[in-house]
Amino acid sequence: MKKAGMVLEGGGTRGVFTAGVLDYFMEQGMYLPYVIGVSAGACNAVDYASHQPGRMKLCTIDFLEAGSYVGLKSLVKTHSLFNMDLIFDIFPNKIIPFDYDTYFSSGMECILTATNALTGKAEYLSEKSDRQRLMTICRASSSLPVVSPIVDVDGIPMVDGGVADSVPIRKALHDGVKKPVIILTRQAGYRKAPAKKTLKMAQIMYQKYPNLIRAIKYRAYYYNRTMELIEDLENRGHVFVIRPQVPVVKNTENHAEVLTDFYNHGYEYAKDIFEQAASFAGWEGEK
């Protein structure tokens, strides 16, 4: 079988769509040997590699009211739009345990994408033994510029991987993935507009990091180029793309009912396209 793998876009709480898709895939036992994720996609990636269907839903939806992990309340309390300590420490280590043992013993290659604030380039990171470093990488991958603190990984300041590489299909292809299954959190045809307000704030906050400012400035351009590449590969049958078929939620959506509907859409849509996705990936069922 040609090497197959998952490529997971981020998108804040839009990641519940991806969680719904992956939960159905995991229930069917479809674990591909490679997964790469960005931001919320990185969070989904580690739960996929640890074989924990339902965990992302628990963290993102079921504990939403109790955790108050997203929104202005979190920004005031923790100086981050998302409560990073809750998501990457309290949840995985106390409330909704992350299965580190299964993750570390898994033969799955799991790559997490962050943006190096010094270079403005993507860093593709992995960890197979150190629990704290794994969660620090996930935190860095999800640390949105301006509204979340910069995170140090191995002494290097990093922010959200989506700044430098929102959908790392090129990295997957470079790693030898011949059958990429890409899960996007935007509808077909979406193109990103320049984030002018974010750029203005970044120019004030990140004067020490000119390459990060440049990456933020050109993020929309590179994102749209990546969408063009994915659409071209899709049209030629070289990738299998899964994307929402209904209007998407905002990346800071914090209403449990809205998120549940979007999660359920991902889960039900996965049912509809499962045989096609499995056939494309060359997956023939659990051995």
Give residue spans per PLM region.
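Patatin-like phospholipase
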Residues: 1-38, 46-287
